[in-house]
Amino acid sequence: MNGTDVAPEVLWKPSPERAARAAITDFTAFVAERTGRELPGYHALWEFSTQDLPGFWSAVADYFGVRWHGQPTEVLPAAVMPGADWFPGGTLNYAEHALATHERGAVEDPAVIAVAEDGTEQLLTLPQLRTQVGAAQLGLRRLGVGAGDRVVALVPNSVQALVGFLATASLGAVWSSCSPDFGAPSVIDRFTQISPTVLLAVDGYRYGGREFAVADTVRKIRRALPGLAGAVHIPALGTAAPDGMIGWDELTSEAAEPEFTPVPFSAPLWVLYSSGTTGLPKPIVQSVGGIVLEHLKSLRLHWDLGPGDRFLWFTTTGWMMWNFLIGGLLVGATIVLFDGSPGHPDLMTLWRLAQRHRVSLFGMSAPYVAACQKAGLRPSTELDLTAIGAIGSTGSPLSTSGFRWIHDEVGKDLQIASFSGGTDICTGIVGGAPTVPVWMGEISCRALGAKVESYSPTGESLLDEVGELVITAPMPSMPVFFWGDEDGSRLRDSYFADYPGVWRHGDWIRITSRGSCVIEGRSDATLNRGGVRMGTAEFYRVVESVPEVADSLVVDTSSSSGDGDLLLFVVFEDGADVEAVTKALRTLIRTELSPRHVPGVVIPVPAVPRTLNGKKSEVPVKRILGGAPVESAVSRDSLADPAGFDAFLQAAREALAAGSRG
């Protein structure tokens, strides 16, 4: 039975003029003429995109003028998961699309703006970028890199990272990167799985006004990769190349125009990694063609990004959003790379950057929005942010108060596009569209080509009810395989074990009768109290709306063997009256959520443990407090702060042993 849906406040609705000039409107007309279908609105287009997969994805390829070298024989012989074979026979090259001159602005317009934390800027036009990529391509060739070989990189969000990736892709080789703030064991766990040919590595990085040398990390990585044919030193801190490494300048010493090696549609483009909460991180391989099509579709149609636009997303090279940001080149936009701390010297840093470079699409994480909100920032009163047309938020669900803050303090005529997807598919499967309204606290729509549904435990499709987020039809950017997973069992176990032939994403979702969505948290971190299920995201929206709460984590220690307790861990703001705030939290949770969800224990902690990708470590904490050994519940190398995790567990155990009751 379906639940009820009461529409929340509409925060933004596109004007008729804005909707008319959106690329998605032109694409809809293109599809209507091509198919003879009537497509009166977004939902009709979405239905077409998920019901006629060959028709939709061939339309995407033709609309964007994909540069085929070998023509595909068909689009999708069989719509099966896993194992969908997209565009068999088709060959292409990612870098050729990223470096194309089609419809780009004036030749002197920057293709890339790279900004360091200290304000140093580097602007590259498309011809300049092509020249650098050509030089790096020649250098990689000299080191023996060819199609299918792996190039790995320990790099910040910099020009060298971009050039290294595009040069790798131009050769038909496979890219994989980690941020230099990763510890050596984390990097080694990732890179050793894919047996790279070449390593690119910086000597250090700058963050929060400080310099961090990583020479020792690089030495350990090189020792762990005995099959390297070459290692390249990038002097971010100005040091000389150590023995056995060549300098970046030497790699790129010979100028050349890049050449593009065509590879099959399903050939690997890059390897991304799961957070690796337990065991080794999953080495997720996405295809050249799948990413080209998906990012063209997402960035041009959903984000309305194109020539003349400037695209900034705060990210590191260890998060899939870096790969997504680079995709801005595919649609002719200028990409803005920021390397540093978003809080140095203060939280206005990125907003000043957005003003200076007239950013059109500004993306961030939901925790960054919360930090700006709690700091009382009012960016639109201090800066001219009128160039921004859309704000993107991902990483975790954007709270209702976060929506309100963006609307009130950044711009009332802004599309607020909270979106969710993940590393597994390197895109959003639910998000926004320039012709769809923004409702307070909700994700506006399901993405084109993403047949997202909400499933009951028995596989019944739900509406206006919370269920398991599943994808019931293949998408081109789904993994073609996990590296080293010879029989495909690890991939099948990761996504298809619960509903055969259906992708289980691992989140709770509610899809409304309007077509909007609400992500309710991870389905393996559900709060189940007296039979009433609740996602953790809903819990955090309430708890973290309290000004005295800096951060929080909630776990339900119940299991199949019996009821457990509901534990709320809180990082209180300095000077907070812990006893009074705890009492207020209990009252707020009782009235805003339910009496069943009032925590049995409220425990002050110094910090909430997070993964390297910034996600709260709910499941490992739940497992450990349920009795699992720490070493089997979490990979320490997956944690952003292993020592902080130890301090968190110590505080939790001491409070529980003392019978702490708030």
Which residue ranges define each predicted feature?
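Conserved C-terminal "lid"/linker of ANL adenylate-forming enzymes
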Residues: 230, 553-559, 567-568, 586-662
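AMP-binding/adenylate-forming catalytic core of the ANL superfamily
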Residues: 153, 178-203, 355, 362, ...
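Conserved AMP-binding/adenylate-forming core of the ANL superfamily
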Residues: 44-48, 95, 112-166, 183-188, ...
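Structural core segment of the AMP-binding/adenylate-forming
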Residues: 170-250, 357, 365-366
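Adenylate-forming
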Residues: 156, 198-217, 238, 316, ...
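Conserved AMP-binding/adenylation subdomain of ANL enzymes
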Residues: 292-310, 320-360, 375-377
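Conserved AMP-binding/adenylate-forming
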Residues: 301, 355, 389-516, 522-526, ...
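Conserved pre-ATP/AMP-binding loop-to-beta segment of ANL
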Residues: 108-110, 231-233, 244-273, 280, ...
